[in-house]
Structure formats: C-alpha cells, structure tokens
Amino acid sequence: MTRENELLRKILRGENEYWEELIGMYYEDIYRYCIYHAPDRNLAQDAVQETFLKVIRYFPNYRDRGKFRAFLYKVASNVCTDQWRKCREEEIPEDTVYLETGYARSEDDIRFLERVRALPEELREIVYLKYAQELTMREIAKVLNIPMRTVQSKLRRALGILKC
C-alpha cells in the first residue's frame, strides 16, 4: 500500500490530522499547475488554497473513485477555470512559469515554448499535463473529462505539430 493510499484510508476513517501530510505531498505540483493556469501569482496562490479547501470539502464524494491525483487535478482545473472566467484576461506569460521554477532559458527553450504556446489550448493543456505534471493518459482523461483515446489522439497530434 502506498503512503497516499494509507493517508486516504485514515482520512476516510475520520483521522483529519493526516490532511496536512497528504496536502504536503501534492502542494508543489498543484502550485505549479495553478501558476501555469492562473492570471497572476497571487491568484495562483489563492487557487491552490481554494483547490485544497474544495478537495477537503468534497472528499466524501471522492470515495476511492479512481486515482486521488486525478481528482485533485480536476478540482484545480475547475478552480483555475473559474478564476479565468472571473478575470477574463489573457493567458499568463510563460515567463512566469520559468521564473517560478527557476529554469534558465536557452534559445532552444524559447523556440520550443513558442511552438507549445502556438498550439491550440486543448492540445497545449494535454502536453502540459503529460510532460510538466507527469500525469498518465488515464489521469489526463479524468482531469479533462474526455475519453482516454481522445487524449491519446490529441497528444499524438500535438507532438506531430511540435516536430515540424
């Protein structure tokens, strides 16, 4: 049994003191996800907090219906989407993601980012979830609420575009 599953079982039994450890396991990943999707850094931090509050609130509805990680990313996705609707602003610059993660940019990085940025949103989201967040195809399908075969074909299409 993984540590995540152990914590989930304890929380399901009402041992709420284990939330802190479970949240700690995913905090950085969800923060990076929200930085990528939120209009600015402060809203990303708000989105992370709101994500975990909603996960705690709606956890009884989860009840081991698939991977917890996919459930968590789905909640984060919904929170960020709600923020975008409220702000009605353009997508955050990719520079923010690099500054947050401390990556240095090379010319190749810049060219690649420009090509990724040029992808349609639906393809860009799948590429980001697959390679930046390292979600499985099945987890991406759950997060985006689309069939796994659709995820596979869209990822294949995105990679084909990026190779050109």
Predicted regions and their residues:
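N-terminal module of bacterial RNA polymerase sigma factors
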Residues: 1-29, 36, 117, 139, ...
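Amphipathic alpha-helical segment used for protein-protein interaction
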Residues: 9, 13-16, 88, 97-143
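Sigma70-family region 2
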Residues: 12-13, 50-67, 86-87
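C-terminal flanking helix
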Residues: 27, 31, 52, 120, ...
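Structural recognition of an alpha-helix C-terminal capping motif at a helix-to-coil junction
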Residues: 32, 46-53, 66-78
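Arg/Lys-rich amphipathic alpha helix in sigma70-family domain 2
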Residues: 60-64, 74-94
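DNA-recognition helix of helix-turn-helix
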Residues: 77, 81, 123, 132, ...
